[in-house]
Amino acid sequence: MENVRLTQYSHGAGCGCKISPQVLDTILRTQLAPFSDPNLLVGNESKDDAAVYDLGNGTAAISTTDFFMPIVDDPFDFGRIAATNAISDIYAMGGKPIMAIAILGWPVNVLAPEIAQQVIEGGRSVCREAGISLAGGHSIDAPEPIFGLAVTGIVDTDRVKRNNRAENGCKLYLTKPLGIGVLTTAEKQSKLADEHKGLARDWMCKLNIPGQDFANVEGVKAMTDVTGFGLMGHLSEICEGSQLKARVDFDSVPYLPGVFDYIAQGCVPGGTTRNFDSYGQKLGAMTEQQKALLCDPQTSGGLLIAVTPDAETEQQLQAIAARHNIELQAIGEMMPLDGDTLIEIC
């Protein structure tokens, strides 16, 4: 099979392909009266990670989909990353994935079908790691390669974790370092140092399985995954939904090695600017360096968790983190809303 650089066949990369929050708000406006279904526990009114439907037996179904264009050149790794990212929404709701189907767009007259087969194989390998079947899918002839999954999961109705239930005083935790967009941009610009090659890929392929365990902790009040809108975008959604503001300690935010050197070299993806243009007016003062990291679009990013500050909850949280080899420290806290600023950086 010929060597190809998949990223050269797409105009965007990973979750950086997302339509900006500002534009998306316009697209989703409707003149129609909302369809009322009492069993729909979570719809799109709160900008949550997935839809949740009450099955009436103490269990709810979770439904989500996610797909994008290549963020890496290797077809197998592209499939792995896209699948990991799609399954993450189930974990972010506190659920367990049970099945996935594939979504494939492929330029069949430009890229060989054997390359697409490797993309699917990468997705299949991650589904197996998550303990689910890749049970089917749909494909179209498309001008650019696109891959992702539609995923179904289940969760106890009293364990659903939403992004709009944070409480005043909650501590904020992030399970993966930031900088995915910066490092992948550095790689695309051939500026990535040898010691950093594969680092972003490995983090993007890390399943957010701990979300299932965090769902069992009563003190975990809100949870979401950090993807294309960056940490500030997804934290803004928590703040807006919970009618609170957040204070973030920048020095406590985890980040990938070398990220600030690459930012200084101009390795900032276009999605960072689009993100800031969409929600920058909600943020407090920050430096250009802080903006480049905190608004950096993540692909298959970590879980952002709002947790009550009591000792018992902290102990439970750290025990789960230890089981999953995660280092957790608080990066900020939720506070009463007292003006137009949703997030302060200190």
UniProtKB/Swiss-Prot annotation:
> What GO biological process term is on the record, naming one?
selenocysteine biosynthetic process
State which Enzyme Commission number(s) the record gives.
Answer: 2.7.9.3
Tell me how the cofactor is bound: Binds 1 Mg(2+) ion per monomer.
Which annotated residues bind Mg(2+)?
49, 89, 225
Please name every pair of cysteines joined by a disulfide bond in this record.
Answer: none
Q: Name one GO molecular function term.
A: ATP binding
Q: Which residues form the signal peptide?
A: none
Q: Name one GO cellular component term.
A: cytoplasm
EC top class, as a word: transferase
Please tell me where ATP binds in this chain.
18, 46-48, 66, 89, 137-139
Q: What is an example of a Pfam family matching this protein?
A: AIRS_C
Look up the record and name the cofactor or cofactors this protein needs.
Mg(2+)
CDD domains referenced in this protein's UniProt entry, alphabetically: SelD
- Superkingdom of source: Bacteria
Does the entry feature the keyword GTP-binding, yes or no?
A: no
Tell me the subunit arrangement.
Homodimer.
The record's similarity note reads: Belongs to the selenophosphate synthase 1 family. Class I subfamily.
Q: What does this protein do?
A: Synthesizes selenophosphate from selenide and ATP.
Q: What is this protein called?
A: Selenide, water dikinase
